[in-house]
Amino acid sequence: MNSAKATSLLFQGFRKNCLRLNRISFASGLINRFTVPARTYADEKVFVRKKPHVNIGTIGHVDHGKTTLTAAITKCLSDLGQASFMDYSQIDKAPEEKARGITISSAHVEYETANRHYAHVDCPGHADYIKNMITGAATMDGAIIVVSATDGQMPQTREHLLLARQVGVKQIVVYINKVDMVEPDMIELVEMEMRELLSEYGFDGDNTPIVSGSALCALEGREPEIGLNSITKLMEAVDSYITLPERKTDVPFLMAIEDVFSISGRGTVVTGRVERGTLKKGAEIEIVGYGSHLKTTVTGIEMFKKQLDAAVAGDNCGLLLRSIKREQLKRGMIVAQPGTVAPHQKFKASFYILTKEEGGRRTGFVDKYRPQLYSRTSDVTVELTHPDPNDSDKMVMPGDNVEMICTLIHPIVIEKGQRFTVREGGSTVGTALVTELLD
């Protein structure tokens, strides 16, 4: 299946179970720590990198048990001292805290196995997470797809596999849930169907680990063979099958801003996922995009409510900035090593325009069409025109592969070879790749 053509399927019915990788569980900790005068850095916990860090998430159809499984993982690992238990209600409601009038999402789960440190996300209801998944800004290193033994594969099972493939997830582990409610023959049938589906969407269906169990039994401490033991087998499979991602740590630092928070008397915090490079506390950085070019110093770094001496590629972290006001910053700006990135407003890109059947436009469009462009965490209006002025009356039709000139209403940091998506009215118009910078 052409993954570009399949992109729009990701957005059909993808509501409640969006996973939001870049949202900030640590932000409340940042604000609380940096604003309590009695506390000093010496009092705070330090994040120690004893194990490789991997970003993971649960995906799958609504009500198949993703959140219950996430809670069960934290419960089973908490008994080993490798996690803090979070029950279903803590995860499902995506709890928010207000600090100085700022609403902060905090449904990000942290845990460890014997071999790795994991950031696991399961945040139902965050509609804006779709934007991150479109652009690949919140790419997971691996995923657990949950499928109910009572239903088998369902529409969102397929959609989420497409989503995972589109954002670059190469390895997935399957958890067949609710096995206590069906006969063994049904479990075998679901496993066979899942292997076929994985192969259909470009995964290794023959060798993908499939674990059967009951997340609810594990959570409630019942029937250990399908409860606790299944969680143990699942995490062993995740450890062994999902390879450690290669992080680009020896290149200049870059992080797209996801959120911005103001801390009175201390500075401003920006949060996001480090795309590449390494950043040490005390380093000078530039913030670029939307016509702004700011310079400042990083006075603090935190992840999972713990201090970091340095942020590296793959980290979901918060940066405390000196002498920068919240009003100067916005989502979509880029934090980077000074002199390494530049904003652009005009470039050439190679497009695939989705068809009506794929959820795209029903009709074509002509020159000066103005949809929204999503790149990393940026969201900006773009005007599309043909490279050859003689083609200005030529209509671009759904299903076309075409080169277009993109002109943004505001400059953003965008690079040759970078992928992006254009959308209109809540649906995806096309996917594209930057082929040439024109300014």
Curated annotation (Swiss-Prot):
InterPro entries: EF-Tu_GTP-bd, EF-Tu_GTPase, EFTu-like_2, EFTU_2, G_TR_CS, P-loop_NTPase, Small_GTP-bd, T_Tr_GTP-bd_dom. Gene3D superfamilies: P-loop containing nucleotide triphosphate hydrolases (3.40.50.300), Translation factors (2.40.30.10). Residues 122-125 are annotated as: G3. Residues 51-246 form the tr-type G domain. Residues 101-105 are annotated as: G2. Residues 214-216 are annotated as: G5. It is found in: Mitochondrion. One of its GO terms (cellular component) is mitochondrion. GO terms for biological process: mitochondrial translation; mitochondrial translational elongation. GTP binds at residues 60-67, 122-126, 177-180. Residues 60-67 are annotated as: G1. GO terms for molecular function: GTP binding; GTPase activity; translation elongation factor activity; tRNA binding. Residues 177-180 are annotated as: G4. Keywords: Elongation factor, GTP-binding, Mitochondrion, Nucleotide-binding, Protein biosynthesis, Transit peptide. Its main location: mitochondrion. NCBIfam families: EF-Tu (TIGR00485), PRK00049.1 (NF000766), PRK12735.1 (NF009372), PRK12736.1 (NF009373), small_GTP (TIGR00231). This protein promotes the GTP-dependent binding of aminoacyl-tRNA to the A-site of ribosomes during protein biosynthesis. HAMAP family: EF_Tu_B. Belongs to the TRAFAC class translation factor GTPase superfamily. Classic translation factor GTPase family. EF-Tu/EF-1A subfamily. This is Elongation factor Tu, mitochondrial. It comes from Schizosaccharomyces pombe (strain 972 / ATCC 24843) (Fission yeast).
